[in-house]
Swiss-Prot record:
Protein name, as recorded: DnaJ homolog subfamily B member 4
Top-level taxonomic group: Eukaryota
Gene Ontology molecular functions: ATPase activator activity; protein-folding chaperone binding; unfolded protein binding
Protein localization: Cytoplasm; Cell membrane; Cytoplasm, Myofibril, Sarcomere, Z line
Gene for this chain: DNAJB4
BP terms from Gene Ontology: chaperone cofactor-dependent protein refolding; negative regulation of transcription by RNA polymerase II; response to heat; response to unfolded protein
Subcellular location, principal: cytoplasm
Any matching Pfam family: DnaJ_C
Length: 337
């Protein structure tokens, strides 16, 4: 059974955006490892960050409410708005979420690095109110501009696009791709960086079309003043030695001689699964002529149990020279027009 993000934050399913922010603020301060020394604090801190990232994003929250954690992370929520598959993967760094929530600063040092007035320890603060006002932070955790009423807003960096080349055989059968990316991650202080490698796993579904987009939200470089970019992979077909692709159909070009084009022939048509299908051609092969073998193409993306067709085009090879006697025979037997 998947994680209950609402339970992790201690809120009801119908909680407002402000309730979610308030709950994250409370839980993050409670379980921050620099404050909470229990063995479970680090894992709880990470769970709280993941829950906040999902529930504070309208699209992720909608998918989670419908399909749960497995649907959110497995791509059950449909497209990303650009024709690609939306799937969520937590970036794994709760300290980056903590720093981003507070606008790239580290209020943790302010709260827990000194005692409050009157000898009251900061760990005892009531964090359901507005504990940030005295330190220049607004209720949602962003730095407060003293000359403005509302909080500043972080902008997300543009998506980082990569091409992902796949063979027709991989599209035919489906496959798993593991893509290694390198990115910058913020340290806990919210200012310095470290380099990090991560493996992103992509499940290539049967029949996916060229141009399909797979989006990993917020997996790009972290900076103090912006939201990490989405990493986007776009499916591109590899060139194939035998076939061309036409949607869910595939095209095979059969090379035959002029004699075979006029008198008929038998050919073996290869398939994507490694078989050969014998085909007799008894008609005269004319320019643009095609034959069709139904159901031997690629799976349909939305119904992979059904497949497109295998189309056979013909390329007629003409002789470079022909004898005078052969020309005479052709003149006698071939129509003039």
């Amino acid at each position: 059974m998947g994680k209950d993000y609402y339970c992790i934050l201690g809120i009801e399913k119908g909680a407002s955006d402000e309730d979610i922010k308030k709950a994250y603020r409370k839980q993050a301060l409670k379980f921050h490892p620099d404050k909470n020394k229990s063995p479970q604090a680090e894992e709880k801190f990470k769970e709280v960050a993941e829950a906040y990232e999902v529930l504070s994003d309208p699209k992720k929250r909608e998918i989670y409410d419908q399909f749960g954690e497995e649907g959110l992370k497995g791509g059950a929520g449909g497209t990303d708005g650009q024709g690609g598959t939306f799937r969520y993967t937590f970036h794994g760094d709760p300290h980056a979420t903590f720093a981003a929530f507070f606008g790239g600063s580290n209020p943790f040092e302010i709260f827990f690095g000194r005692r409050m007035g009157g000898g009251r320890d900061s760990e005892e603060m009531e964090i359901d109110g507005d504990p940030f006002s005295a330190f220049g932070f607004s209720m949602n955790g962003y730095p407060r501009d003293r000359n403005s009423v509302g909080p500043s807003r972080l902008k997300q960096d543009p998506p980082v696009i990569h091409e992902l080349r796949v063979s027709l055989e991989e599209i035919y059968s489906g496959c798993t791709k593991r893509m290694k990316i390198s990115r910058k991650r913020l340290n806990a202080d919210g200012r310095s960086y470290r380099s990090e490698d991560k493996i992103l796993t992509i499940e290539i579904k049967k029949g996916w079309k060229e141009g399909t987009k797979i989006t990993f939200p917020r997996e790009g470089d972290e900076t103090p003043n912006s939201i990490p970019a989405d990493i986007v992979f776009i499916i591109k077909d590899k060139d194939h030695p035998k076939f061309k692709r036409d949607g869910s159909n595939i095209i095979y070009t059969a090379k035959i001689s002029l004699r075979e084009a006029l008198c008929g022939c038998s050919i073996n048509v290869p398939t994507l699964d490694g078989r050969n299908i014998p085909m007799s051609v008894n008609d005269i092969v004319k320019p643009g002529m095609r034959r069709r073998i139904i159901g031997y193409g690629l799976p349909f993306p939305k119904n992979p149990d059904q497949r497109g067709d295998l189309l056979i085009e013909f390329e007629v090879s003409f002789p470079d020279t022909i004898s005078s006697s052969s020309k005479e025979v052709l003149r006698k037997h071939l129509p003039a027009s």
